[in-house]
Amino acid sequence: WIGLVGSEMCIRDSSITADRYFYIVGRFLLGLYFLLPGLAKVFLFQDNWDVVVLREVPFPTFSLSLVAIAQIFFGTMLMVGKYVYMGALVLAVVTLLINFYIHDFWNMAEDANQAHETQNFVKNLGIFAGLLVLSKRSTQT
């Protein structure tokens, strides 16, 4: 009986350890998901600015700069485990704004580009959901 209790404890402890590792790896990958595009916005500013102007995003230079800063800063913070709650919520808002301004498939002709933007839109909804879960989880650790 004691051995069984001891075995359960080991299983429970390893489950907690695995949960912690999954949280850290998931948080790191979500951070990387935002850091890399943020850096791309800086180093390929003109290309990204052209897209932002084409999609009629308000205040294109300011908006693009702000999104790049948010993605770089909060993406990095997610990766290192700082400001996770705030970072996840800010990046969730950024993700929704990108979805509605950049991946607006409903404003496109029915072709391969529309299908691609629909896929990006749905993918971003999954990222948005992950950020919401991360924000909740970060308040519990």
Q: Residue spans of the language-model regions?
A:
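Membrane-interface extramembranous regions
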Residues: R12-F73, V80-T141
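Single conserved hydrophobic/aromatic residue that forms the stacking wall/gate
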Residues: W1-D13
